[in-house]
Regions:
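Secreted/periplasmic proteins
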Residues: 1-99
């Protein structure tokens, strides 16, 4: 694995948080291509991949979290739809920091 990559459990958050402020001060939009990460700088672009189905999406870090171990990322509801894990709620995902 590349030094800018990680693998771990990702989850999603969505409609219940719509309109609330994210950690960087934006209003959360469940359809936006955004994610929460505990340490990466805001506005970092991350390719999140679901190895189970081969889907991937580029997301922008705009929030902090997840706060549940051992999860490594929370993605927006829209991103989870595109990655194909809304029903499961969790996925073992691959994260690759871009740029």
């Amino acid at each position: 694995r590349a030094p800018n990559a990680a693998e771990g459990v990702a989850s999603w958050y969505g409609p219940g948080f719509a309109g609330r402020l994210t950690a960087n001060g934006e209003r959360f939009d469940p359809a936006a291509p955004t994610m929460a990460h505990p340490r990466l700088p805001f506005d970092t672009l991350v390719r999140v991949s679901n190895p189970e189905n081969g889907r991937s999406i580029v997301l922008r870090v705009n929030d902090r979290g997840p706060y549940v171990e051992p999860r490594i990322a929370d993605v927006s509801y829209g991103a989870a739809q595109q990655l194909g894990f809304v029903q499961n709620g969790l996925v073992v995902a691959e994260l690759e920091v871009l740029g």
